[in-house]
Amino acid sequence: MEHNLSPLQQEVLDKYKQLSLDLKALDETIKELNYSQHRQQHSQQETVSPDEILQEMRDIEVKIGLVGTLLKGSVYSLILQRKQEQESLGSNSK
């Protein structure tokens, strides 16, 4: 199945692909940090309450939500900007 994509569409898809790869890398980094932190805590015989972990996860969730919102806004702004450029080029050529 062949898809005919405009350069802008291809660029947006490439950016989403890169974002996906970056999020996967972030996930792996978080897992590694959690694992090393978990090992440190057990070696020091300290325990973290579930409430503390839950609060940290909520903070991370809020930050990720903000990043997602900013990304969506940036993509939307880029699409509008490109559309306006195309319209101005179209009106100038008439």
Swiss-Prot record:
Question: Which terms are listed as keywords in the entry?
Answer: Cell cycle, Cell division, Centromere, Chromosome, Chromosome partition, Cytoplasm, Cytoskeleton, Kinetochore, Microtubule, Mitosis, Nucleus
User: Which compartments does it reside in?
Assistant: Nucleus; Cytoplasm, Cytoskeleton, Spindle; Chromosome, Centromere, Kinetochore; Chromosome
Keyword Nucleus applies = yes
* One GO cellular component, as annotated: DASH complex
Single Gene Ontology BP annotation = mitotic sister chromatid biorientation
Pfam families for the chain: DASH_Dad3
Q: What is its main location?
A: nucleus
Q: What is the documented function of this protein? A: Component of the DASH complex that connects microtubules with kinetochores and couples microtubule depolymerisation to chromosome movement; it is involved in retrieving kinetochores to the spindle poles before their re-orientation on the spindle in early mitosis and allows microtubule depolymerization to pull chromosomes apart and resist detachment during anaphase.
Quote the record's miscellaneous comment: Present with 468 molecules/cell in log phase SD medium.
The family assignment reads: Belongs to the DASH complex DAD3 family.
The entry describes its oligomerization and partners as: Component of the DASH complex consisting of ASK1, DAD1, DAD2, DAD3, DAD4, DAM1, DUO1, HSK3, SPC19 and SPC34, with a stoichiometry of one copy of each subunit per complex. Multiple DASH complexes oligomerize to form a ring that encircles spindle microtubules and organizes the rod-like NDC80 complexes of the outer kinetochore. DASH complex oligomerization strengthens microtubule attachments. On cytoplasmic microtubules, DASH complexes appear to form patches instead of rings.
Report what the protein is called: DASH complex subunit DAD3
Name the gene: DAD3
